């Protein structure tokens, strides 16, 4: 098979004949100045796999990944055609006795296409390893990134719920792990930059990152929330804002510290962290105000009710176990900080008053003390 990776303006290539490995049709060599070198079918005949021109950024990234996998003794094959599933991954490699289909994705891809390609590889016993082009990533603050539905496809497909990016210009991987949403499209992440010459394929693809969170960055996000005007809120956010004002006479900027807990499993929620935790906080403090026991089963049921009523949105379909873990991690944190006290297994009481803070400075100090590292 012949590839145009690294091809220059060479007229000799144009005099040679090339044929598509999939349909057998004759190909033309395109060596223009505007686009990266690529093949195109000479005639408008249907082909099972379209040969589309790729950006120079994408081609260079793919070339570097291929060369790197060769140094890793992973026996890489560039763009092999897998006839049984009619797919052609960017690179196929063998790492730790596993066959990997490395897909370097720089362009937007529809969710159904992403899912089909992922499931196709799995069907053949091949592990899909998606790597996003670094150019598609936007950093919004220290340790915070803008992550859309496009990005979450990659995260959800990863066994470690992480996002691996590669930049051919910097020749480095960027590994985002332990991703915790603050807003719907604005998430905290532990970040690791790994130059490609120092990266080990086994460690990068088959080792779970160690848990880590910089609370200082999370606290700054809370402070930005408290000082920004809240003019364009979603319906669910507005419902919560009205409830806090009606039930607690609490302005939105004065939401309690306890509704901003960075829960590792919180990525199951599409709603902002203060929304899903805010509804549960009101339920628990209502019970606490009546000196009634707060049962985990009741809090979980309340969460499901709010999901059903569209007050809380899930990012995607999730099992009851995932939802239960997220709610349990939230309650465990509140116990750790002394807000709740467990009296018997999964039964709690409110350990301290829910209100009492009216100064913004006092509230900011409370944020800092709660999330001190």
UniProtKB/Swiss-Prot annotation:
* Keyword Metal-binding included in the entry's annotation: no
One GO BP annotation is: establishment of competence for transformation
Where does the protein principally reside? cytoplasm
- Keyword Cytoplasm part of the UniProt annotation: yes
The entry's cellular-component GO terms read: cytoplasm
**Location(s), subcellular:** Cytoplasm
Q: Which domain of life is it from?
A: Bacteria
Q: Which UniProt keywords apply?
A: Competence, Cytoplasm
Which Pfam families did the record assign? Answer: CoiA_C, CoiA_N, CoiA_nuc
**Role summary:** Required for optimal transformation.
**Protein name as it appears in the record:** Competence protein CoiA
- Source species, please? Bacillus subtilis (strain 168)
